[in-house]
Amino acid sequence: MSGKKRTASSTRWMQEHFDDHYVKLSQKRGLRSRAAFKIEEIQQKDKLIRPGMTVVDLGAAPGGWSQIAVKLAGETGKVIACDILPMDPIVGVDFLQGDFREEKVLNALLERVGDAKVDVVLSDMAPNMSGTGGVDQPRAMYLVELALDMCHQVLAPNGSFAVKVFQGEGFDEYMKAVREAFTTVKTRKPDSSRPRSREVYLVATGYKL
């Protein structure tokens, strides 16, 4: 029965994907994923990235967010991206492939950042979903906690943070931790985020720790 459910669910996802307005629009605009529209919508509302800024993009593959970030940061800016999956090169993006949960990968990422502080940390990271909430939610919360730790290590005063979080156990505590670190925290559900998804984006500005 579970195999049939998974098959039905997969079929539904594929149908949704190919019928999806944002998938078609991303292909038309030469964007690597529909996720690009999420950061684009956030940028329109919150103006996180400006020319000359340094941006770290966690969970970057296939590159939708990095495409938008490098365009906004411009030639004087810098985008450093990381993902466990490979990513085709993007002009102006310094990409590191590796598991962000591993200390050696974190250290390699910090090396690429160097002594300069980062203006914006972006995280669209998500674990491989098993479909079991009791397994998936803790994994997802662990990743967003690592992203917040990254902010504490590299973010400049008054810097910004945009992170995908799945609503569920641990969400309220995480929101509290983000509020302690930033002056303003807003919850965004972009139009391009699928309605039935539990994902929301926390957009935090004014880093103060």
Curated annotation (Swiss-Prot):
Matches recorded under InterPro entries: RNA_methyltr_RlmE (IPR050082), RNA_MeTrfase_FtsJ_dom (IPR002877), rRNA-MeTfrase_E (IPR015507), SAM-dependent_MTases_sf (IPR029063)
Pfam families, A to Z: FtsJ (PF01728)
Keyword Transferase assigned: yes
Localization of this protein: Cytoplasm
Catalytic reaction list: uridine(2552) in 23S rRNA + S-adenosyl-L-methionine = 2'-O-methyluridine(2552) in 23S rRNA + S-adenosyl-L-homocysteine + H(+)
E.C. number: 2.1.1.166
Superkingdom of this protein's organism: Bacteria
Entries under Gene3D superfamilies matching the protein: Vaccinia Virus protein VP39
Catalytic residues as annotated in Swiss-Prot or TrEMBL: K164 (proton acceptor)
UniProt keyword annotations, A-Z: Cytoplasm, Methyltransferase, rRNA processing, S-adenosyl-L-methionine, Transferase
Main EC class the enzyme belongs to: transferase
Positions annotated to bind S-adenosyl-L-methionine: G63, W65, D83, D99, D124
Gene Ontology cellular component terms for the protein in this record: cytoplasm
Gene Ontology MF, one: rRNA (uridine-2'-O-)-methyltransferase activity
PANTHER family linked to this entry: RIBOSOMAL RNA METHYLTRANSFERASE, RRNA METHYLTRANSFERASE 2, MITOCHONDRIAL
Function: Specifically methylates the uridine in position 2552 of 23S rRNA at the 2'-O position of the ribose in the fully assembled 50S ribosomal subunit.
Family: Belongs to the class I-like SAM-binding methyltransferase superfamily. RNA methyltransferase RlmE family.
Protein name according to UniProt: Ribosomal RNA large subunit methyltransferase E
Gene field: rlmE
